[in-house]
Amino acid sequence: TAEGVKKITGYTTDIITDVTLDWLKNGRDEDKPFFVMSQHKAPHRNWQPGPKYLTKYDGIEITEPDTLRDDYKTRTSAASTQAMTIRNHLSSNDLKLRTPGNLTPEQKAKWDAAYGPKNDAFRKAKLEGKELVRWKYQRYIKDYLRCVAAVDDGIGQILKYLDEENLADNTIVIYSSDQGFYLGDHGWYDKRWMYEESLRMPLIVRWPGVIKPGGVDRHLVQNLDYAQTFLDVAGIDIPDDMQGRS
């Protein structure tokens, strides 16, 4: 911050939400328009869920993508020699077979209670082949979705604040990401490859009075267009040396 380094203990997703709300409530000039970016990273590797959702989806089997066991026979050799398969390349940290070293005692107790019994059962099972891939996929996708659940909570809190403060009808909300992601598609996690699952990403806009709720626009947009769009909406001239367009 402008005042120096500030250390906050907690789950990063919750902290980002809390800091955003604190600025909206206490940090802005309420007589002026505002612009705030609330940027979450939890769904990024290594998909570390917060204490609230450590056991969410336990006892549920997530449907596997049809291409989870893709053999890449119709692709170039590079597709089969990459290092991002669920079968071979998820680390013990990715799979939560090791307890993170950055937890408080209270967080560690909750973590061990959630993952300890399941990890013990996995080690005893000595899975191989398709069964091992199935287990890894379930661990990966559930942790990913646990992270997303916390992000959903945070976004919901921000939208609720806008409603409660009568700001929703005069505020543009834009929800997006930096890229798509493989959730077991082609047997992969991560991004890297320009297939549809990685190339496409969400761009959801709530603009009361301008964009009809539920509408779909199929024009192509890139994330290098975002800054120009923000400037245009704010009535600020767009520098000629910026790429992209509003």
Q: What residue spans do the PLM features occupy?
A:
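Active-site-proximal cap/lid insertion segments
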Residues: 2-12, 24-32, 37-221, 233-242
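A conditional alpha-helix N-cap/helix-loop micro-motif detector
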Residues: 13-17
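Generic recognition of well-ordered alpha-helical segments
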Residues: 19, 200, 222-233, 246
